[in-house]
Amino acid sequence: MKKLLPALLLCLPLVTVAEPVRQINNQRDMCQAMLQGVAFNLYLEKTCGFNGGVSRKLAQIGARQCADIFTDREARALSEEAIHKGTMRFEGFGKSQFCSANRQGYNDAGRLADDFLKRKP
């Protein structure tokens, strides 16, 4: 679980305009949060024009920490769920408010991902 702790920290700032953070009890929960974080941050990059490469960085971390946790079908469904929730929030808040509210979390996630990727695998 010590290896999971830094990765868990990455999941916390990912979604500013969101539902409450889900409890993470094990590696599968952490990997689900990571996978959905990748999808949501990719949505932010495409929708808001954020260009910090956070989704790519989180995908690298997920590849290290979460190999073979989900089938391709499960991974696709979880990603689609995160994108759907992002779309609903975007429509509810409007582009300006949605992007503004998620900017700091996106930047924080990028810094945490950079720190995590500097560590040895």
Give the predicted meaning of each segment:
Residues 21, 38-39, 88, 96:
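Helix-centric, low-specificity signal for extended rod-like, repetitive segments
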Residues 22-73:
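Short N-proximal segments of mature Sec-exported proteins
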